[in-house]
Regions:
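Loop-to-transmembrane helix entry
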Residues: 1-21
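C-terminal ends and interior cores of transmembrane alpha-helices
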Residues: 47-59
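Intracellular juxtamembrane helix-capping segments at the cytosolic ends
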Residues: 77-91
Length: 162
């Protein structure tokens, strides 16, 4: 952690996270222009999935700007749209309970991934080699695309079009 390469990589990650944040803000401005919430949410997830998967193929640090801009699109949509879509799919009673359970479906996978992700990645790594973390990014991209398809399983009952 004291090597020059490590410090340069850490600095570059900070730049990429800033690019992701900029992409998120710009996409958040665009989201209200779309009337169909499920469509824009699914599109955002697909764009984020493409961003994550593209990191596998990109070998130029500056081209990663495009990848992280796309990841920012998914991030912007994930902050608000799932709860809006869910509340529109529920009728009044027990809404707090459902929202709490829904929040658990977000938090529990994050905790499991943080606790076990490295171990799972190591299972697919040859003995004596470092695990290829890029596989986790590709997996994240695939999961976002699967999630985009699942968006259409939810039927909003009120306010279908904003």
């Amino acid at each position: 952690t004291k090597s020059l390469q490590y410090q340069e990589a850490a600095n570059w990650v900070g730049v990429l996270f800033a690019v992701q944040a900029i992409g998120s803000v710009l996409w958040a401005i665009c989201i209200p222009m779309f009337k169909d919430r499920r469509f824009i949410y699914a599109l955002s997830l697909v764009l984020g999935g493409i961003g994550f998967i593209s990191t596998y193929f990109v070998h130029s640090p500056y081209v990663l700007f495009v990848s992280f801009l796309l990841i920012g699109c998914a991030w912007a949509a994930m902050l608000a749209l799932p709860f809006t879509i869910l509340t529109n799919a529920l009728s009044g009673g027990h809404m707090g309970t459902y929202l709490g359970l829904f929040n658990g479906t977000i938090c529990i996978p994050q905790i499991v991934a943080a606790a076990l992700g490295g171990s799972i990645l190591a299972l697919f790594t040859p003995e004596g080699m470092l695990p290829p973390e890029i596989n986790m990014l590709v997996t994240a991209g695939v999961m976002l695309i699967i999630g985009a398809a699942c968006v259409y399983l939810i039927k909003e009952t009120k306010g279908e079009r904003a």
